[in-house]
Regions:
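ATP-binding pocket architecture of kinase catalytic cores
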Residues: 1-123, 136-140
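Conserved protein kinase catalytic core
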Residues: 17, 33, 133, 142, ...
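Residues that scaffold the ATP/ADP-binding catalytic core of kinase and kinase-like folds
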Residues: 36-37, 145, 163
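ASCE P-loop NTPase motor core, strongest for the SF2 helicase catalytic module
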Residues: 117, 135, 153, 163-166
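Catalytic-loop of the protein kinase fold
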Residues: 123-125, 130
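Activation of the activation-loop gatekeeper triad in protein kinase-fold domains
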Residues: 146-151
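Active-site activation/catalytic loop segments of kinase-like enzymes and analogous catalytic loops
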Residues: 158-181
Length: 181
């Protein structure tokens, strides 16, 4: 048991014939999911509390003893950034329909700019953002983190960076970023 709020898993199906891949069923949580990172449906104090709660839960996630909960072999510790760059480059190449010079430049630039030094290793979510959280119906309290398919052992700073990415994206062209707010 940890302080990380997750929906309880009810069943796992490993038969690919059912829906084309493995899947699991989890409990239903009655709560709120905020799709827009500006959280326009709440006031400023509530918005601050929501983001404070995200930070609190992220710290709890990264404080989990992977050995203590039996996850020491959950992923490959070390080289997290290189593994992620390789994974996303392969996925991009598999779905690429035309050459994008900006993406090509990024794919070339990233491997040469991986942070130097020893990476911290923790349980990371891999997709830690506001709309992957279920909040209590009336309180700014996370009752469940969703979408764990990218979770692994890796550098916890990557989760923090992913969470903060919304602050860098503009709020235009269908992107719900927070830059300039």
């Amino acid at each position: 048991h940890t302080d990380v709020p997750v929906p309880q898993a009810i069943a796992l199906c490993t038969d690919d014939e059912i829906i084309g891949s493995m899947f699991y069923v989890m409990e239903h949580l009655d709560g709120r999911i905020f799709w827009d990172p500006a959280v326009p449906e709440v006031n400023n104090a509530q918005r601050t509390a929501i983001y404070d709660e995200m930070n609190r839960v992220l710290a709890a996630l990264h404080s989990v003893s992977v050995e203590g909960v039996g996850l020491s072999d959950y992923g490959k510790p070390g080289n997290y950034y290189a593994r992620q760059i390789g994974r996303w480059t392969k996925q991009y190449r598999a779905s690429e329909t035309e050459l994008d010079p900006d993406m090509e430049a990024l794919i070339e630039w990233l491997p040469d700019h991986i942070p130097e030094g020893e990476e911290s290793v923790a349980l990371v979510h891999g997709d830690y953002r506001l709309d992957n959280m279920i909040f209590h119906p009336t309180e700014p309290r996370i009752i469940g983190i969703l979408d764990w398919e990218l979770s692994t052992l890796g550098d916890p700073l990557a989760d923090l960076a992913y969470q903060l990415m919304a602050w860098q994206f503009p709020r235009e062209g269908g992107i719900a970023g927070l830059a300039g707010l």
